């Protein structure tokens, strides 16, 4: 699921990518319920709907006409594949337990993930685009490896140990909230009313999902 968003971004829009990726927690819930018997109650369902609405409010900037004008491309299929891939990865982390601690386990996953992508990298390097190995390149690679890589994946794995696959999946809806506020902080975008509405709805949905008396463990 790591390479798919980059492929999707070549032919589809950020709005489409954001909307489609919000389906990932839904796939986590469906797969967990169908194949692993994890129960899903009514309040968790309302939490899911509330999160979805909150994310959509931010993505479409509070303007419903954004949805009417959407056009879909092959990139949307790549993004759908990324959403399903993340769902499968999340379920794998939770249901296939490992004797290894979090960091050694992540190291092995990252190693074999990089190994599986190596042939595709070589094909791209030879036939399409040569990588320029300079200071700028190594700075961005280091940032990608440390922040969204080691830190984010490790914390996500730790959260799953305590909350389960489907409940932890709801934290993905925070990405849209964080992304909006990063745009305000780093790119001088304006804070609008829809940011407040969407953020409140997302946090309300996550609160409903994570209430201890609403979480039903795998039967």
Named regions from a protein language model:
Residues 45-57, 74-81, 89-147, 174, ...:
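Hydrophobic alpha-helical transmembrane segments of multi-pass integral membrane proteins
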Residues 1-21, 57, 145-163:
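Specific transmembrane alpha-helical segments of multi-pass solute transporters/efflux pumps
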Residues 5, 24-49, 174-197:
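C-terminal transmembrane-helix exit sites in multi-pass transporters
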Residues 3, 26-30, 84-87, 118, ...:
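Hydrophobic/small/kink-forming positions within alpha-helical transmembrane segments
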Residues 10, 59-72, 122-136, 140, ...:
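Membrane-interface helix termini and inter-helical loops of multi-pass transporters
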Residues 43-62, 117, 173, 182, ...:
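Hydrophobic transmembrane alpha-helices of multi-pass small-molecule transport proteins
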Residues 13, 36-41, 101-102, 164-165, ...:
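A helix-boundary/kink motif common to multi-pass secondary transporters
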């Amino acid at each position: 699921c790591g390479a798919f968003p980059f492929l999707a971004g070549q032919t589809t829009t950020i709005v489409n990518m954001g909307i489609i990726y919000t389906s990932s927690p839904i796939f986590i819930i469906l797969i967990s319920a169908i194949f692993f018997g994890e129960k899903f109650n009514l309040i968790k369902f309302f939490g899911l709907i509330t999160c979805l609405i909150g994310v959509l409010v931010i993505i479409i900037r509070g303007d419903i006409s954004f949805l009417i004008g959407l056009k879909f491309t092959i990139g949307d299929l790549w993004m759908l594949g990324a959403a399903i891939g993340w769902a499968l990865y999340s379920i794998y982390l939770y249901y296939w337990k490992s004797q290894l601690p979090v960091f050694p386990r992540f190291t092995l996953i990252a190693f074999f993930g990089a190994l599986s992508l190596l042939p595709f990298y070589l094909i791209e390097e030879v036939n399409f685009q040569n990588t320029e190995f300079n200071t700028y390149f190594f700075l961005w690679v280091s940032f990608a490896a440390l922040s969204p890589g080691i830190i984010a994946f490790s914390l996500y794995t730790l959260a799953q140990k305590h909350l389960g696959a489907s409940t932890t999946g709801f934290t993905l809806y925070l990405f849209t909230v964080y992304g909006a506020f990063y745009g305000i902080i780093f790119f001088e975008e304006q804070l609008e009313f829809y940011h407040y509405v969407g953020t409140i709805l997302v946090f309300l949905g996550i609160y409903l999902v994570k209430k201890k008396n609403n979480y039903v463990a795998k039967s």
